[in-house]
Amino acid sequence: GVSNAADIKLEVLTTDTEGAKKQAEVLQEQFQKNLGITVEIKQVTYKQRLEMEQTKEYDMVVTGWVPDYSDAYSYLELWISDGQYNHSGYNNPRYDELLEASQFETDAAKRQDMLFEAEQIFLGEDSALVPLQLRREQYLVNPKLENFNVYFVGYDFNLVYADLAE
């Protein structure tokens, strides 16, 4: 163990954008202020960050995900032990079992319970990830624009069914 938090030094990996830098600086400040832990910021290109994630060359990494469809599975599948996007090395057999079983469960309530249990394991018991933000957008829309739908996941909006009233 470590007897003094000041002896802990971590590096946070992020992309080389101004927004990513500001986010990493907030993390750096909070770790120092609340835990006494020193955090260095390492900014690299997006491509380099992805490569470093895949090879697990980081202590902490700031990354993001926008789900492909409106279902909890679209988030949770990222952390299946042998999953293509599991760049953390996270591994929990019970989590994997729940995700696998949820794919074949036809009772929507039971499936939701399975996914909720998996989420509790991942975020609660194992604390494998710390959500930092939820992306939301604001839109000012002309009242004459009908059937304009804003989506929570994936693309922000789709104009396929939109129509401008007379």
Each language-model region and where it sits:
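Short, well-ordered beta-strand elements
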Residues: 7-16, 39-42, 59
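Short, contiguous strand/loop micro-motifs
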Residues: 14-15, 35-37, 85-86
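Detector for C-terminal structural segments
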Residues: 18-30, 50-166
